Amino acid sequence: MIKAGAIIAIGAIMVSIAIAMYFYDQYQPNFSYAEAGEPIQVGPVRYIVEYDGTHEGDEDTVPENIFVKIRIKATNLSDEDTRMSGGQFYIVDENDKKIQPVYGDFSDEDLLDYYLEPNKESTWTTQFDVPFDESKQWKIGIKPTKVQSSLDIGVICLLNC
């Protein structure tokens, strides 16, 4: 009687561990890696991200360091409009410190908040206030928006990877 109870208890523990591992595996992010200028898909959107230089801001927004600007070409591969936001992007320095973009009205191409139509391509820019050094390693991270409900995360080597 005690042996049967022990076997049932051990079996229940094994089943619960198997279920927990299944759900853990289902909700792990899927990392995709690319070089600057190469296409990368995050959720329903294919991106091409390139380094677009540096700038000193404008009269309204002056950086603490310098603005590093990236050019983002995005194509919506789904059948529905999808939201695009500058907050999806972050720059990562060689110490793995994530830095969010700085929003401003620097040009007509600035990505603030936009809905990308199905099978359409658009190009935007965004910038990051960082202590930029061209000899250091810089990466761009791309997260999907909440509406895109994807576990994909894109990592793009911007410089010196």
Where are the regions that the model predicts?
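The feature marks short-to-medium sequence segments in extracytoplasmic or secretory-pathway proteins
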Residues: V62, T75-S122, D152, L158
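Short edge beta-strand/loop segments characteristic of extracellular beta-sandwich folds
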Residues: R71-T75, Q127
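Surface-exposed edge beta-strand/loop patches
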Residues: I2-F23, F89-Y90, L116-C161
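Short strand-coil-strand connectors
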Residues: Q41-V45, E94, K143-V147
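Short, solvent-exposed loop/turn segments enriched in Ser/Thr/Gly
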Residues: E64-I70, S122-T123
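Sec-dependent signal peptide cleavage junction
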Residues: A20-A34
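Low-complexity, acidic Ser/Thr/Pro/Gly-rich terminal tails and inter-domain linkers that flank the onset
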Residues: N30-E64
